[in-house]
């Protein structure tokens, strides 16, 4: 059993129940609603590399993305050799037919989709953006090529050792996230621009996938590679975690500051002191909670509203103190307070970072995926590789979440 992901509104989730078979389950009421089976794969169609990959925890048999609760899903079977891993199918689950098939030059790593756009990430660090209404290719973004062009313009040549590292897969993977709103705000990680010799993926690009134009560029959101990324439903917030996994940061995707302040850091939380591989994060529909899960026995839930109120109180007290000292005019107080409320958290020492508001204890020997349902506030869905689907309530006062119900699949 291998859980893949929830859809955009957490009304369904997908899982691999047996080889070459992918199942979609409805969350409320809980039950199986679709099963996709592929023909039996012969030994000739699965090469050694693919079989080795399939045994690892990092490689799913399928890459899937559902379109809310509609009958359309995008699916790639990565368990049938490298040729199949380059083919993406759009499937109608009601008719059990393939609507269209797309073939890419490299293996498909991830798919994100909403009602307007589908974005496909390849192992070559390329992002293909499609109009979902007609499956027309609108744009191709090459993250690695952009970095290599920068290196050429700066040094006049590209180091072969850099290209070699990329081909050998020694660098971290590009991460992508697309908001479920029709605005289609796409966020993806990019190679560090401030250090042209660095091939760390710790920059963040905010891209308008509806109008095909860049919106914002966030430099060095973490010291190390960004290992996990998620975006709010409305596309206004993006959350990041590095490969170390101790700090979680949330940024504004748009540049709304009237003062030049660099990255728009909204929130910063400490997940823990020990390193952790965070593999999924979710922001709830109201933008109050952020949940993250990794290779530990705890799912952390952070309260963004609570920290925002604390930041406002801190900025108000600091701006008032400055006024008393005669360092600010009354006219500039509101502007400065607004600026400070957005940036003050970056000045707080690490040891004072807020930790989780609520948590869920889980089995750290299995993988879990998260969902915040649109129709139920203060509720979290957890689907796990051990075949359990759990519904949890977030307590108003915080602390350990309350298990509401549990189902087996």
UniProtKB/Swiss-Prot annotation:
Q: List the disulfide bonds.
A: none
Q: What is known about what this protein does?
A: Required for cytoplasm to vacuole transport (Cvt) vesicles formation and mitophagy. Involved in binding of phosphatidylethanolamine to ATG8 and in recruitment of ATG8 and ATG5 to the pre-autophagosomal structure. Protects ATG8 from ARG4-mediated cleavage.
SUPFAM superfamilies of this UniProt entry?
Answer: WD40 repeat-like (SSF50978)
> What are the alphabetically sorted keywords of the record?
Autophagy, Cytoplasm, Membrane, Protein transport, Repeat, Transport, Vacuole, WD repeat
Which branch of life, at top level?
Eukaryota
In chain numbering, where does the motif L/FRRG motif fall? 269-273
Q: Where in the cell is it found?
A: Cytoplasm; Membrane; Vacuole membrane
Q: Does the keyword Cytoplasm apply?
A: yes
Gene3D superfamilies in UniProt = YVTN repeat-like/Quinoprotein amine dehydrogenase
Q: What is the lineage of its organism?
A: Eukaryota, Fungi, Dikarya, Ascomycota, Saccharomycotina
What does the UniProt entry state concerning the protein's domains? Contains a beta-propeller domain involved in specific binding to phosphatidylinositol 3,5-bisphosphate (PIP2). The L/FRRG motif is essential for the cytoplasm to vacuole transport (Cvt) pathway and for the recruitment of ATG8 and ATG16 to the PAS in nutrient-rich medium and in both its recruitment to and dissociation from the PAS under starvation conditions.
Q: Does the keyword Hydrolase apply?
A: no
**Family indicated by similarity:** Belongs to the WD repeat PROPPIN family.
Per UniProt, what is one GO molecular function of this protein?
phosphatidylinositol-3,5-bisphosphate binding
**What is this protein identified as?**
Autophagy-related protein 21
Task: Indicate how the chain sits in the lipid bilayer.
Answer: Peripheral membrane protein
| GO BP annotations, alphabetical order | autophagy of mitochondrion; cytoplasm to vacuole targeting by the Cvt pathway; glycophagy; nucleophagy; pexophagy; piecemeal microautophagy of the nucleus; protein localization to phagophore assembly site; vesicle organization
Q: Which Pfam families match?
A: PROPPIN
Q: Which GO terms describe its cellular component?
A: cytosol; endosome; fungal-type vacuole membrane; phagophore assembly site membrane
The record's listing under InterPro entries reads: PROPPIN, WD40/YVTN_repeat-like_dom_sf, WD40_repeat_dom_sf, WD40_rpt
Q: Where is the signal peptide?
A: none
């Amino acid at each position: 059993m291998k859980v893949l992901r929830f859809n955009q509104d957490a009304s369904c989730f997908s899982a691999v129940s047996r080889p070459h078979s992918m199942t979609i389950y409805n969350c409320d009421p809980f039950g199986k609603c679709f099963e996709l089976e592929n023909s039996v794969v012969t030994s000739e169609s699965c090469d050694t590399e693919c079989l080795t990959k399939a045994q690892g925890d990092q490689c799913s048999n399928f890459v899937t993305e559902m379109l809310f609760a509609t009958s359309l899903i995008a699916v790639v079977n990565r368990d049938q050799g490298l040729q199949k891993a380059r083919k993406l199918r759009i499937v109608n689950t009601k008719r059990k037919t393939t609507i269209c098939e797309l073939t890419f030059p490299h293996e498909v790593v991830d798919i994100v989709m909403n009602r307007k756009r589908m974005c496909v990430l390849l192992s070559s660090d390329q992002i293909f953006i499609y109009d979902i209404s007609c499956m027309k290719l609108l744009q191709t973004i090459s993250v690695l090529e952009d970095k290599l062009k920068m290196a050429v313009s700066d040094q006049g040549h590209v180091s072969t050792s850099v290209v070699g590292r990329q081909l050998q897969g020694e660098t971290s993977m590009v991460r992508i996230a697309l908001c479920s709103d029709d605005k289609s705000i796409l966020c993806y990680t990019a190679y560090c621009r401030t250090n042209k010799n660095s091939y760390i993926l710790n920059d963040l690009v905010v891209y308008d996938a509806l109008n095909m134009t860049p919106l914002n560029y966030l430099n060095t959101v973490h010291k190390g590679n960004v290992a996990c990324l998620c975006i709010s439903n409305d596309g206004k917030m993006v959350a990041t975690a590095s490969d170390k996994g101790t700090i979680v940061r949330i940024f504004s995707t748009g540049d709304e500051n009237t003062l030049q302040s660099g990255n728009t850091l909204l929130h910063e939380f400490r997940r823990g002191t020990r390193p952790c591989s965070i593999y999924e994060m979710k922001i709830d529909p109201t933008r109050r909670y952020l949940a993250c899960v990794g290779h530990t026995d705890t799912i952390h839930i952070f309260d963004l509203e609570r920290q925002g109120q604390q930041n406002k109180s801190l900025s108000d007290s600091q701006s008032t103190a400055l006024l008393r000292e005669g360092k600010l005019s009354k006219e500039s107080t509101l502007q400065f307070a607004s600026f400070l409320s957005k940036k003050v958290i970056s000045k707080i020492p690490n040891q004072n970072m807020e930790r989780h508001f609520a948590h869920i204890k889980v089995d750290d020997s299995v993988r879990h995926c998260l969902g915040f349902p649109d129709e139920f506030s203060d509720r979290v869905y957890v689907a796990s590789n051990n075949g359990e689907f759990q519904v949890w309530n977030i307590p108003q006062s915080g602390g350990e979440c309350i298990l509401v119900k549990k189902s087996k699949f």
